[in-house]
UniProtKB/Swiss-Prot annotation:
Claim: Nucleotidyltransferase is one of the keywords in the record: no
UniProt source species: Clavibacter sepedonicus
One function term, GO molecular function aspect: proton-transporting ATP synthase activity, rotational mechanism
Protein name from the UniProt record: ATP synthase subunit c
Keyword Protease applies: no
GO cellular component: plasma membrane; proton-transporting ATP synthase complex; proton-transporting two-sector ATPase complex, proton-transporting domain
Pfam family of the protein (one): ATP-synt_C
UniProt topology in membrane: Multi-pass membrane protein
Function comment: F(1)F(0) ATP synthase produces ATP from ADP in the presence of a proton or sodium gradient. F-type ATPases consist of two structural domains, F(1) containing the extramembraneous catalytic core and F(0) containing the membrane proton channel, linked together by a central stalk and a peripheral stalk. During catalysis, ATP synthesis in the catalytic domain of F(1) is coupled via a rotary mechanism of the central stalk subunits to proton translocation.
Transmembrane regions: 13-33, 55-75
Length: 77
């Protein structure tokens, strides 16, 4: 195959790969936030502690998306 066409195909596949890698953290953030709201409804006095834990969980989930983004830039060059 022509090297230019091969490079374009590789770039497009990497873009799709990053999109798929972002799905997992998106689902994870939704689950964490939903379960936190559910827990706050059950025990309102724990809301502050639950909120802090929720933000930590969201941060760890989003770290996966950032790793996926970094991987995209590493492998497309």
């Amino acid at each position: 195959m022509d090297p230019i066409i091969t490079a374009e195909i590789t770039g497009n596949i990497a873009t799709v790969g990053y999109g798929l890698a972002a799905i997992g953290p998106g689902i994870g953030v939704g689950i964490v936030a939903g379960k936190t709201v559910e827990a706050m409804a059950r025990q309102p006095e724990m809301a502050g502690s639950l909120r802090t834990t929720m933000f930590l969980g969201i941060a760890f989930s989003e770290a996966l998306a950032l790793i996926g983004l970094a991987t995209y830039f590493i492998f497309t060059n």
